[in-house]
Amino acid sequence: MATWDPKTLQGFQLAADSLKLYRRADLSEPEQGVSLIDELYVDPLPEDKVLRTVAHASTTFVIGRKGTGKSTIFQRLQSELRRTKHQTSAYVDIKTVFESSQVDPLLLERLTKLDSALPPATLERILLYKEFLRAVIAEIKSELRKRVEASLWERVKETVTHSVSELFEGLDSVLEESNEERFISALGLRTDTIKTKAAESSESTTKVGGAATVSAKPSLSISGEQTSHKSQATDQERNYGEVLLRSFDIKGLISRLKEVLEELGIRNLYVLIDDFSELPEEAMKVVVDVLLAPLNNWSDEFVKFKIAAYPGRLYFGAIDRTKVDEVYLDVFKLYGGGEVGRMEDSAIEFTRRLVRSRIQHFCSVDPKVFFEGDETEIWRQLFFACMANPRMLGHLLHFLHESHLIRGRAIGLRAIQEAADRYYEEKIESYFRLGKFLHESFAERSSIYSLKELLEAVVGRARDLKSHDSEVIRKIQGQHPTSHFHVPVSYEPLFSTLELNFFLTKYFEMSDRSGQKVAVFALNYGLCSKYSIRFGRPTGEREFRLYFVERFFDYSALVLAFLAKNQEIVCDNPKCKAVFSHERLDAIQQYGMLCPSCKSGTVRVTNLSRKYAAELNAVNKDLLLPNIELGILQTLHVEKEPMRPAAIAGELDCSYQLIGKRGKALADKGLVDRSPNEQGHRLLKILPTAEAAYFSTAPNDALNLESDQENKSQPPSA
């Protein structure tokens, strides 16, 4: 039995916890509180290539799934900027700002009494946009004050204090004006503009000018010349946003910011936008159309946005995509430029560097002292288990510390398999079980369960292929791996949600045997462990390099069968309701989804679960909850102990303020208990009523496969 002293074991736990950190949780020394970001940052690419790209004076989208290190890169960037003389930064957690924005009901009531006011629903949305922008400006102001007071600027602080004070007074003035009735009058006049714009553009110009004269700033101008034209509905919404934005006089604000910061020698303001993809789709568009795109275009190269986003959850709006950098952090985008073996080697090396950096700092030993067996194979299996995702890797190390190290057992291949299995069951598998309780329409919940049907078909096929025979398979010693499959790249969007939730990962792009470009996906390592699917690819033979694109791994027919069964393509015109086959979808898309039957309706594509329709219909509507509240219950259920809001926030990748607010709502519903501990900190604890309602074992919680699971007698890797 291996033994390690208590200090070394504690250091391993700290190393694991440092990788588990979410969002803006500081990477710091536990006792001294000193920042460790410079010492422990490990760039995914050699020579700090990712950091250097993000540090360019250009707008950048940093794109990756949860846990890929977007916020860590932002922290490292800010640390770097604090040592420069010509740039500064402002971090804005968009999701938290959005959640905290409120519509003033008294102001809404006053607006609805005006004859020229917009409809109440539209007013509520616009006022929400206004509050959202106000909060963003306040965040930037707060960060700039910290920068002015920083030690780097001590020598110049006295010379600029007066200017900075004036700047902040100006910001406060702008915020105050947003709540005055002249702001409301501008909205009222704009209503007439929208109604007449389609009929005669010259009349529209006159009315826009009228709106400008009401503003408190005589120099403020509102012009229709910059309006984009996509559709009448979209044009209307964007014009509202422009009136709102220009009522804040953002262009003037940026000019004043620039003037003050130029006195400090600052040439660029980097605004770091985190959790962008956590916003609802409508809010995401508003943020870009009303805030990011105008600031990016108006600021004369002064403001540079760094935007953290999820793959497939992006919206560029008027931002010129050819003029921004896009940095991807998931494994294929990072390392997939060569052949698959080189990609794996690069990802394994990043995993090794990441773990070694943390273990050497917190334990002062090499990671191999915790391993048993072939060290090279252990690193390979750790990569397979986490797909080079730092946060997932942290959870795996935490589980390994808990299940093996503190019990005197070293980490081997079986231990990694068990940790991955546990991670899948605790962190990933619950997506479908909780999905049926999501406070959304039946169609939305059915769409989630349709993906469960797709995943079941994929996993079932992978299990069936274990008994497949071919010339290539006969050359493989032992059980051949079936964890990967390929589909034409045009089918990728069907798997995007499953990938975003870590059921699978895009592994590579290759040309299949017929020369067609295909996307290769890898099933989650823990999922493969649970369902006895051997993971990886064989090595040793030249022809094994094309193993992933063998014809029996082509799942195109499976996808087409799923679409035929679950996808509805229907015209939304109540008088038409024409239904179309999947084969006609490409042609319909070329005409902007215009219905070819009635020539007026829009064709809608919906994925519905027929297999689980009865189960979804049977859910008591009183049990439906927002996603964040379901996440709180899931976390409390898994941890099996009372937790502080900050700890829950760490698991759910959100702010502790949001957890506190939603925790109170759950307590009001009798689902959790909110009681202070001895130190006066309020703790949340799941109640038996919630356990019974949401977590009672049901036959369909796990994947419903036709055949029973086989005995897991082998590790899941080749």
Predicted regions, residues:
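Walker A/P-loop-proximal flanking segment of P-loop NTPase domains
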Residues: M1-L114, P716
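Extended, charged/polar low-complexity intrinsically disordered regions
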Residues: M1-L21, D26-E29, E149-E154, Y491-S496, ...
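Short acidic, S/G/P-rich loop/turn micro-motifs used as interaction or catalytic elements
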Residues: T68-G69, F98, F276-E282, L314, ...
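P-loop NTPase nucleotide-binding core
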Residues: S71-I266, P311, T322, G601-T602, ...
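C-terminal leucine-rich, beta-strand-based interaction scaffolds used for sensing/assembly
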Residues: K95, M392, E402, I411-Y656, ...
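Conserved nucleotide-binding/hydrolysis micro-motifs of P-loop NTPases
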Residues: T96-E99, P311-Y315, P390, L400
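P-loop NTPase catalytic cores that bind/hydrolyze ATP
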Residues: L123-E166, G170, T376-Q417, F485-L527
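The catalytic "switch" region of P-loop NTPases
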Residues: E237-E375, W379, I416, A420, ...
